[in-house]
Amino acid sequence: MNFYGYKRPDGRVGVRNKVLILPASVCASDTTRIISQQVVGSVTFNNQLGCSQVASDQQFTMDVMAGYAANPNVYGTVVVSLGCENCQMDLVVEAIRERTNKPLKQVIIQEAGGTLKAIDMAVRYAKEMVEEASLLQREEFPMSELIIGTECGGSDPTSGLASNPLIGQLSDLIVKEGGTSILSETTEFIGAEHILARRAATPEVHDRIYEIVHRYEKALQLVGEEVREGNPSPGNKAGGLTCLEEKSLGCIHKGGHSPVNAVYDYGKQVEAKQGLVIMDTPGNDPSSVAGMVAGGAQIVVFSTGRGTPTGNPLAPVIKITGNKLTYANMVDNIDVDASPIIYGTKTLESLGDELLKLTQKVACGKQTKAESLGYTEMAIARVCNFV
């Protein structure tokens, strides 16, 4: 099976062709919003971080910024910084260049002479990139070039019974095609980590699965918290989920039945053609999705029982529900109804084939519901308050 995408100079393949206006910190975010509004074909996001962070949090921010610029769906990037933030322009550019050789321009507001001059400069850079990007034509590539991210949010009992297993079926099909599938949300492995660990391809991966889960539990204990006090969420419980273990058993279904070949830290570059891998992300949907997109995911497949509009600035998000009432109520937001699996009118295998074909169409340019509505939620994981 093949799809039509955009070949990048670093060898990877995009399914979208965007110019990214990248804010290096919160102090540049409003400026990038104004810039992007003036250049059709560009995208940006509201970066609430980039300054006054402890080292581990700053690394998260740097990895996401570099990963976004390197994501195959991006033609080129205009980085905009204020000039005095911790995420200095030279550090951001260096991090990006370690991942990709795609077009890159930089604007520092303080050095440009203020906001208006910085906007004028960045708009000219972005306009030139958009014009260059428009000349590219889609080419045919095997599905092995795809990296999909898998996510679940607003879960209810149908998530573990239908939509998550359906994503798992897609994951196995992508792996069979030679592609890569990312399983995320470490906090929702808790209580089911032993099942995942049994599927580890190597002893090192086995140990890493336990390590990332135990690290989350210990971090919460250090501040006097218990993960089960906030997970399942009130919405999960209202939907019918009873406990964290039930939620976790549903969550790991998104990984299908393939061996787990690697465990990646948050936002780190994921290698293509690696089969099933795990990324150590929070359970929070926008920040988990951001980590996978920073890792190189071109498409995200998202299961929801209660319904959610979540999207992403760079990657199309395919939304799936196993709850037929949610599908009827939020059809404007949901791409796939997986409830026939529960009612026995369709099999997991047949719906899996349909979802693979939809994923192929999205890779070729078909817009998802989140894309057509303009949803671009974005958050970056953190472990500590500002300093």
Question: Would you name each region that the model predicts?
Answer:
Residues 1-151, 155-299, 303-387:
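Metallocofactor- and cofactor-centric catalytic cores in central/energy metabolism, strongly enriched
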